[in-house]
């Protein structure tokens, strides 16, 4: 309501058709970033270690991001117990800690530009299925230490963002030092 999908360009409309065929109709919301309830971004932290995904894409497929899958979250749950409603899920890949550098004019940024340009592997990014899995558990905020929750692949990125936006769940991106938090028992405030 209030959003006109007809304003999307042809590429986005094509991705929208694929998304809706697989996941159902995209829902609209009036929850812009200024209207996200503060309590959504505060809660017990569950840090899902996905560092094992780093280095798993074939350089011939770049730009590409390793996919964070439901199985990764389930493996975390086997070790630390089920994710509970109200927890904040943080995906720890180590990407930003490893690649963030002070900007240098004329030098390709290794954190964001190089992966987007296909010169290095992208940051690990959750699939829409993974997003839906943690939201189904009652999670109201999802965070990552990557530059974006979405993959370096534009189609995958849009679908991941639509999965959360359709369910009014905000993302927090570009975290640093996520690996210094315990897998369970920490607390997140954004």
Regions from the language model: what does each represent?
Residues 1-190:
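Active-/binding-site microenvironments in catalytic and ligand-binding cores
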